[in-house]
């Protein structure tokens, strides 16, 4: 690597989020364009940079900086240039010249040690002298803090965040308890804090480390869908994480409990340990559900007469279970309606909507995802929104949702109907219930046999299994649905019955292939050539669903192959390498985590903004429309024309989406799905997963692979255990 010393003449571009900067550096007689992370550098400052020269295809020769060191200006010319650069507010070129003319090379010592002497310069009052000294000292303190933090391997961008949070306290915090960073600083997790702690010499059995490790293990468990862990399991996992004895971990539970960081709940012989936030979410959710469960006295004859009128007006014909669902909706403030595909959930919802519309009630419809909300709108004829949009997402704190609608500003409506409830996790459910005022009716609709939510909890399943709230199960498959082999076979799968694979169907096919590469070739032909014509859709509308991320038929490998086949490299398409992936303009991508602070806009073809909002969520899919290397941004257009500009630092939140996991497809519906099946772990390759995959298709399901694996999945009812206590909390709230 080469070294380059000089002064910063001009900052061309700076990304304030990550500190990435393009600047002109004057080194001797040369002016060089430098690129790198320079969060704290200002024009006029002297630096010594380490890096390499590179040739950018658009911007020419650049010096790519890996590290740099700020140098205090030493001669009068350098001092004057720095002071007059604008780095110190209140000092212009003329003032800088007067200061340096008076104090010469001693200028910085005077400012730092004898600032009162600055009044000797014309135009500087005592107050201004102190302001100048304060700014110079702040910059000196920041520079020293950066040097201190970087010895722990902390990046410049993160170092600035840490210093902005703690200021001069940073020295004590890093030497005594670096694990505070994991609690206080966005982007610092336990592992980062643990690395810093190791370099700071913190003992491996330090109470700070053990307690942070326990909380981190619970956080990891929530990412796997759990709201708590049994004590024995939590102890074992934390012991493995930290590499210390279980006894040391057990000793720290009481202190964490006293500090209300964890809640320890006894359930029979099992001790359940929650992060406090998840326990209170479950407890509050249970309480709020019970408060909404109000009984209304309405005569059977009155309800039946209204249903008959609706049937005559719409031509709909309800069966006894659907009629019962409407009656329960009228008589109760809270109702759950569950059933598989083709069992009449949509007809039931439509009847309920029209019933309460006749009563003059205001009705809100919502679903967890944009795709599910759009489908709800299409099937009901009424506007439906995402739950986040209904609750008026405002971005909240970093990493968490904040909603305008809550207990102090509830939704102004008489009835809320939520579809695809199997996707709703405990966090979103808690926020939803806070926004529903007492006396507002709530109807929850979903299929209990779908996969559970990606986020923590088993909300729909727990509500139904509590047997404490009103639930109607729809089981009859209606005649029009019974002609669809997708629906018929989905119910057979759910009942564990044999499914015919003779390919005599018009919408359900199984192509038997037994080698991964052959399966992939068939998938490619289906997606690009055969299915688009068959279902009248584009190749991008055909969704490949696979059980796993890794492996020969995993998401990662399939996406690379499908990208080359559907969106190959082209001189007209810009690309961005990111880790093992290449993003290309025209690629189909998916958001992989909830980001409540991402801003989106919907614009006309003339560039006028017609709508805007915040929040892009796990599973949202879109198309890359622009990659801009200079601005370090990538623009993605999601459903409904929502455009989002991603800075390069956020690209970890995106992945290619030609193929996605079955779990990620939950709540979505596609014209056709292709499901490659070969083999996999029995805990994953189960009936529940297969049922979810098959029910994602509207017009056609095509499975490609091993028929033995398909039949084994139908018979395999094993599932990974998900620890959730909402069922118990609901039962407790009844007592």
Model-derived features: where do they sit?
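Accessory, non-ATPase domains that flank or precede helicase/AAA+ motor cores in DNA-metabolism machines
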Residues: 1-302
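Loop/turn positions that initiate beta-strands
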Residues: 44-46, 586, 619
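The Walker A (P-loop) glycine that initiates the GxxxxGKT/S ATP-binding motif of P-loop NTPases
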Residues: 87, 120, 339, 367, ...
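Conserved RecA-like ASCE P-loop NTPase motor core of nucleic-acid helicases/translocases
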Residues: 335-377, 445, 508-515, 530-551
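Conserved helicase motor core of SF1/SF2 NTP-dependent helicases
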Residues: 351, 355, 359-361, 370-377, ...
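Conserved helicase motor core of P-loop NTPases
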Residues: 448-614
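C-terminal accessory regions
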Residues: 610-611, 618-735
């Amino acid at each position: 690597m080469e070294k380059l010393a000089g002064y910063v003449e001009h900052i061309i571009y700076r990304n304030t989020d990550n500190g990435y900067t393009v600047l002109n550096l004057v080194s001797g007689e040369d002016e060089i364009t430098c690129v790198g992370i320079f969060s704290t550098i200002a024009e006029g400052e002297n630096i010594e940079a380490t890096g390499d020269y590179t040739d950018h295809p658009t911007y020419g020769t650049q010096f790519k900086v890996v590290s740099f060191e700020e140098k205090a200006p030493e001669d009068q010319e350098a001092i004057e240039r720095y002071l007059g650069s604008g780095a110190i507010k209140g000092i212009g070129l003329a003032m800088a010249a007067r200061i340096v003319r008076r104090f010469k090379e001693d200028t910085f010592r005077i400012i730092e040690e004898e600032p009162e002497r600055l009044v000797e310069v014309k135009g500087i009052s005592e107050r201004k002298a102190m302001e100048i000294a304060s700014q110079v000292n702040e910059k000196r303190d920041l520079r020293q803090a950066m040097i201190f933090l970087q010895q722990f391997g902390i990046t410049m961008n993160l170092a600035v965040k840490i210093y902005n949070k703690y200021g001069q306290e940073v020295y004590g915090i890093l030497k005594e308890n670096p694990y505070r960073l994991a609690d206080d600083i966005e982007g610092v997790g336990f592992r980062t804090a643990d690395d810093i702690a190791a370099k700071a010499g913190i003992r491996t059995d330090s109470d700070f480390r053990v307690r942070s490790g326990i909380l981190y293990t619970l956080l990891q468990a929530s990412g796997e869908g759990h709201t708590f862990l049994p004590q024995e399991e939590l102890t074992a996992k934390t012991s493995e994480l930290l590499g210390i004895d279980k006894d040391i971990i057990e000793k720290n539970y009481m202190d964490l409990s006293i500090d209300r960081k964890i809640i320890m709940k006894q359930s029979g012989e099992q001790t359940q340990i929650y992060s406090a936030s998840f326990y209170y979410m479950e407890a509050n959710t249970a309480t709020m559900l019970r408060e909404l469960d109000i009984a209304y006295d309405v005569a059977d004859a009155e309800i039946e007469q209204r249903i008959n009128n609706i049937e005559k007006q719409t031509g709909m014909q309800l069966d006894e279970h659907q009629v019962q669902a409407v009656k329960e909706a009228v008589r109760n403030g809270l109702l759950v309606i569950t059933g598989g595909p083709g069992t009449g959930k949509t007809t039931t919802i439509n009847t309920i909507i029209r019933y309460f519309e006749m009563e003059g009630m205001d009705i809100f419809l919502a679903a967890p995802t944009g795709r599910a909300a759009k489908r709800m709108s299409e099937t009901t004829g009424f506007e439906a929104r995402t739950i986040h949009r209904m609750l008026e997402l405002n971005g909240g704190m970093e990493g968490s949702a904040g909603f305008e609608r809550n207990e102090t500003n509830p939704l102004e409506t008489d009835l809320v109907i939520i579809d695809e409830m199997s996707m709703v996790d405990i966090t979103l459910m808690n926020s939803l219930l806070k926004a529903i005022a007492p006396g507002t009716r709530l109807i929850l609709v979903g299929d209990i046999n779908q996969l559970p939510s990606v986020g923590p909890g088993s909300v729909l399943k727990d509500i139904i299994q509590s047997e404490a709230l009103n639930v109607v199960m729809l089981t009859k498959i209606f005649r029009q649905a019974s002609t669809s082999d997708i629906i018929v076979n989905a119910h057979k799968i759910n009942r564990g019955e044999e499914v015919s694979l003779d390919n005599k169907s018009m919408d359900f096919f199984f192509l038997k292939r037994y080698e991964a590469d052959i399966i992939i070739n068939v998938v490619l032909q289906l997606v690009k050539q055969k299915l688009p014509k068959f279902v009248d859709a584009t190749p991008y509308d055909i969704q490949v669903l696979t059980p796993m991320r890794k492996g020969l038929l995993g998401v990662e490998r399939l996406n690379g192959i499908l990208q080359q086949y559907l969106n190959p490299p082209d001189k007209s398409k810009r690309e961005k390498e990111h880790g093992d992936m290449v993003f290309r303009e025209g690629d189909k991508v998916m958001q992989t985590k909830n980001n409540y602070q991402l801003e989106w806009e919907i614009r006309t073809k003339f560039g006028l903004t017609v709508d805007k909002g915040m929040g892009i969520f796990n599973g949202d899919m879109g198309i890359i429309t622009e990659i801009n290397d200079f601005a370090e941004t990538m623009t993605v257009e999601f459903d409904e024309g929502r455009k989002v500009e991603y800075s390069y630092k956020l690209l970890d939140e995106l992945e290619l989406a030609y193929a996605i996991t079955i779990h990620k497809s939950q709540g979505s519906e596609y014209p056709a799905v292709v499901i490659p099946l070969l083999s996999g772990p029995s805990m994953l390759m189960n009936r529940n997963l297969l049922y979810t995959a098959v029910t994602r298709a509207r017009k056609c399901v095509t499975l490609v692979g091993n028929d033995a694996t398909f039949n084994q999945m139908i018979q395999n009812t094993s599932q990974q255990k998900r620890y959730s206590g909402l069922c118990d909390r609901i039962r407790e709230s009844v007592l």
